[in-house]
UniProtKB/Swiss-Prot annotation:
Subunit annotation: Homodimer.
Biological processes per GO annotation: L-histidine biosynthetic process; methionine biosynthetic process; purine nucleotide biosynthetic process; tetrahydrofolate interconversion
Protein name stated in the entry: Bifunctional protein FolD
Chain's gene name: folD
This enzyme's EC code(s): 1.5.1.5, 3.5.4.9
InterPro entries associated with the record: Aminoacid_DH-like_N_sf, NAD(P)-bd_dom_sf, THF_DH/CycHdrlase, THF_DH/CycHdrlase_cat_dom, THF_DH/CycHdrlase_CS, THF_DH/CycHdrlase_NAD-bd_dom
Chain's role: Catalyzes the oxidation of 5,10-methylenetetrahydrofolate to 5,10-methenyltetrahydrofolate and then the hydrolysis of 5,10-methenyltetrahydrofolate to 10-formyltetrahydrofolate.
Pathway: One-carbon metabolism; tetrahydrofolate interconversion
Organism: Vibrio cholerae serotype O1 (strain ATCC 39315 / El Tor Inaba N16961)
Matching Pfam families: THF_DHG_CYH, THF_DHG_CYH_C
Catalytic activity: (6R)-5,10-methylene-5,6,7,8-tetrahydrofolate + NADP(+) = (6R)-5,10-methenyltetrahydrofolate + NADPH; (6R)-5,10-methenyltetrahydrofolate + H2O = (6R)-10-formyltetrahydrofolate + H(+)
Any one of the GO CC terms: cytosol
Family of this protein: Belongs to the tetrahydrofolate dehydrogenase/cyclohydrolase family.
Length: 286
C-alpha cells in the first residue's frame, strides 16, 4: 500500500477561491469587505514570515488587511490598549495577535482581551468552550483546517479511533474536541503518556503535533490509517520534515499529509474562513 497524499495546498486554494467569491458578492451588494487586523509585537523572524503570509492571503481574497507592528519594547498596556481600540472598530471583523509574544507579556491576558466575536484565531476560552459544548462558532485554525482536509477527501470519521499526539492549546486539545464532535473515539497522548507506541498502533486517524523531526517511526502506523502530520521542522541539511517518519509511514497509511504542503496552508485558509464568518454573522451592518 502507498498512501495518497492529502494536498493541503490545493484544498487551501479552493477554500480561498470560495471566500473570494463571497467577498466579491458582498461588495457588489454594496456591503464593505471583511477587515482583519494583524498585530505583531517585536521582530521575531519566523513570526514576520507567518504574518506576511497571512496579510498577503487576506489581500488576495479581497479583505481589508490592517497591519499593526509594535516594537519588542512595547508595554503590555500598549498592546491591550490597541486590542481594545480594534475591538471597538466597526470596520474590523477579526483581530489576530501573532504568537509568541515577547517575554514578560501575559499571553492569556492578551488573548482574553480580544472580543470573542473577533477572535478569528479561535483561542479565546469562550470559543474553545463553545467547541467543547458542541456549538462551535470561531474554531481554532489548525484543527479546523485539518477537519476541512479530511472532509474534502471524504475520509469517514464517525466511529473511528483517533489518536492525537500533543496536547497544546493551539493544536492538540482543540483537535481532540474537533474529532470528538466528528464522532471519533479519541485518545490524547502527551509527555506523561505510557506506551505511546501501543496507542499509535491502534489509531485509525493519527494527528501528530509535537514539533520533533521524525518523532513517530513509520513502522508504528496501523495499516490503512490516516496520518495527519502537523509538525514542520528544519533539519541541519535545510530539509523540512514533519513529526512522522514520512517515507515509511506512507507505505502503511491510506492517506497522509506531506510536509510541507499538507496542514500548513490550511491554517491560513481557516483564518480567512473565520474572518469571513465573523463578518457575515456578527458584524453584518454596513
Amino acid at each position: 500500500m502507498t498512501a495518497q497524499n492529502i494536498d493541503g495546498t490545493l484544498i487551501s486554494q479552493t477554500v480561498r477561491s470560495e471566500v473570494a467569491a463571497r467577498v466579491k458578492a458582498r461588495v457588489q451588494a454594496g456591503l464593505r469587505a471583511p477587515g482583519l487586523a494583524v498585530v505583531l509585537v517585536g521582530e521575531d523572524p519566523a513570526s514576520q514570515v507567518y504574518v506576511g503570509s497571512k496579510r498577503r492571503a487576506c489581500e488576495e481574497v479581497g479583505f481589508v488587511s490592517k497591519s499593526f507592528d509594535l516594537p519588542a519594547t512595547a508595554s503590555e498596556e500598549a498592546l491591550l490598549s490597541l486590542v481594545e481600540e480594534l475591538n471597538n472598530d466597526p470596520q474590523i471583523d477579526g483581530i489576530l495577535v501573532q504568537l509568541p509574544l515577547p517575554a514578560g507579556m501575559d499571553t492569556t491576558k492578551v488573548l482574553e482581551s480580544i472580543h470573542p466575536e473577533k477572535d478569528v484565531d479561535g483561542f479565546h476560552p469562550y470559543n474553545v468552550g463553545r467547541l467543547a459544548q458542541r456549538i462551535p462558532k470561531l474554531r481554532s485554525c489548525t484543527p479546523k483546517g485539518i477537519i476541512t482536509l479530511l472532509e474534502r477527501y471524504n475520509i469517514p470519521l464517525r466511529g473511528k479511533h483517533a489518536v492525537i499526539v500533543g496536547a497544546s492549546n493551539i493544536v492538540g486539545r482543540p483537535m481532540t474536541l474537533e474529532l470528538l464532535l466528528a464522532g471519533c473515539t479519541t485518545t490524547t497522548c502527551h509527555r506523561f503518556t505510557q506506551d505511546l507506541e501501543g496507542h499509535i498502533r491502534q489509531a485509525d486517524i493519527l494527528v501528530v503535533a509535537v514539533g520533533k523531526p521524525n518523532f513517530i517511526p513509520g513502522a508504528w502506523i496501523k495499516e490503512g490509517a490516516v496520518v495527519v502530520d502537523v509538525g514542520i521542522n528544519r533539519l541541519d541539511t535545510g530539509k523540512l520534515v514533519g513529526d512522522v517518519e514520512y517515507d515509511v509511514a506512507r507505505t502503511r497509511a491510506s492517506f497522509i499529509t506531506p510536509v510541507p504542503g499538507g496542514v500548513g496552508p490550511m491554517t491560513v485558509a481557516s483564518l480567512i474562513e473565520n474572518t469571513m464568518m465573523a463578518c457575515e454573522q456578527f458584524h453584518t451592518q454596513g
